Regions:
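Short loop-beta-helix segment that forms the pyridoxal 5′-phosphate
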Residues: 67-89
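Short acidic capping loops at alpha-helix termini that bridge into adjacent secondary structure
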Residues: 73-77, 98, 184, 204-205
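N-terminal "arm"/small-domain region of PLP-dependent enzymes with the aminotransferase-like
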Residues: 1-53, 144
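Active-site phosphate-binding strand-loop segment of PLP-dependent enzymes
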Residues: 121, 127-188
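PLP-dependent aminotransferase-like
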Residues: 5, 92-150
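PLP-dependent enzyme catalytic core of the Aspartate aminotransferase-like
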Residues: 164, 317-318, 329-358
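Conserved PLP-binding catalytic core of the aspartate aminotransferase-like
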Residues: 271, 284-318
């Protein structure tokens, strides 16, 4: 079995369907509990109707459900075919003079800026400093009429943006007539009270962009949300193509956003499994676990294996796929990331790592 690496992890689609079913894909950060029961029921009940008709171009039922779930007015949101579409459209709309992005971080921050024809610069989050935000460097690089991306939590290190750092960057954005985009695609794994969406919907210099496919486990359906000032939400919505959120995605998310038991259980489960995985990795003599707070773990090789590619090769007989992180700006080939999956799958990973330790 051979799997090519893509810019977002392993590409399993080059395998046969039979081989795909054998892979334990720890390179993708999706809720291990799978579909929301309420969302699944909605899909089963409405799949034929939603397939045979055009979706609601205004996403009315979904916006109402998300408004109830997250406490954000419907007029302060725009919905897209995943968070990535909204990032690209925001950059097209705002067209800042310069974009600065964290390194390491989600590659689409830089790519969305390049697609909009904007110059891009990086500021570095250093592992030996706990991936702390370098506020002095940001202040120097954030020019007037620029844009800054921040992850909260950041991918791949899982670090949260502290309230004091958020306030400092927001103040800089205001002073320099610039714009702040916070990517909260993994925030649901942490909790509602740590989000900054309630602040930025009242500001004209910022937005929260959020993938709904990670926590609600529907990457194949594709859906994302932007939370921002109503005037800007309207402008962003006008840039989106009609019917960009399909009917099945709308039906599923409308129900899943109200599945309170699923939301609570997912957080508890992922946190418990993360702690067990971290403890097991700490017991290995060739892996250093970096602290984080979300449903994935960033690690560094410190012994037997020189690169994550080498580790991936020895894990292939176990049908295990990890995320090699050498293509993240600011990380080298000793870094890799693993998602928190089911208890059974996590145990398979732990046993495999133990087997290749010696």
């Amino acid at each position: 079995m051979s799997i090519k690496s893509s810019r977002h992890g392993g590409d399993v689609f080059g395998l046969s369907e039979e081989e795909q079913d054998k892979v334990f894909d720890f390179s993708i950060n999706i809720n291990p509990l799978g579909l929301s029961p309420k969302g699944r029921a909605a899909l089963l009940a409405h799949w034929e109707k939603e397939t045979l008709r055009y979706p609601d171009v205004e996403c009315r039922a979904l916006k109402k459900s998300l408004s109830i779930r997250y406490g954000i007015p419907e007029e302060s949101m725009a919905l897209g075919n995943g968070a990535t579409e909204l990032m690209y459209k925001l950059l097209e709309l705002l067209h800042p003079k310069k974009v600065i992005v964290p390194a390491p971080s989600f590659s689409e921050y830089r790519l969305s800026a390049e697609a909009a024809g904007c110059p891009v610069d990086s500021f570095f989050l250093k592992a030996d400093q706990g991936f702390a935000l370098p506020l002095e460097e940001i202040e120097k690089k954030l020019l007037r009429h620029s844009l800054i991306y921040l992850g909260h939590p950041n991918n791949p290190d899982g670090q949260m943006l502290s309230p004091s750092d958020f306030e400092a960057v927001l103040r800089l954005a205001k002073e320099k007539e610039s714009f702040l985009i916070i990517d909260e695609s993994f925030i649901d794994f942490v909790g509602d009270d740590v989000s900054y969406r309630h602040v930025l919907v009242n500001e004209t210099c910022g937005a929260v962009v959020m993938s709904l496919t990670k926590f609600y486990a529907v990457p194949g359906l594709r859906i994302g949300a932007a939370y921002l000032h109503p005037a800007l939400a309207e402008r962003l919505q006008d840039t989106l193509i009609p019917w960009n959120v399909n009917g099945l995605a709308q039906s599923y998310m409308t129900a899943a956003a109200q599945d309170i038991d699923y939301i609570r259980n997912s957080r508890v489960y992922c946190q418990a499994e993360r702690e067990k995985l971290s403890a097991a990795f700490d017991a290995l003599d060739f892996v250093k676990v970096l602290p984080g707070s979300v449903n994935f773990i960033l690690c560094r090789l410190i012994g037997r294996y020189q690169t994550a590619e080498e580790l991936q090769e020895v894990l292939m007989p176990y049908h295990i796929l990890i995320r090699q992180c050498g293509n993240y700006e600011g990380l080298d080939e000793t870094y890799f990331r693993v998602a928190v999956r089911t208890e059974e799958e996590n145990q398979i990973l732990i046993k495999a790592l133990g087997a290749v330790e010696n």
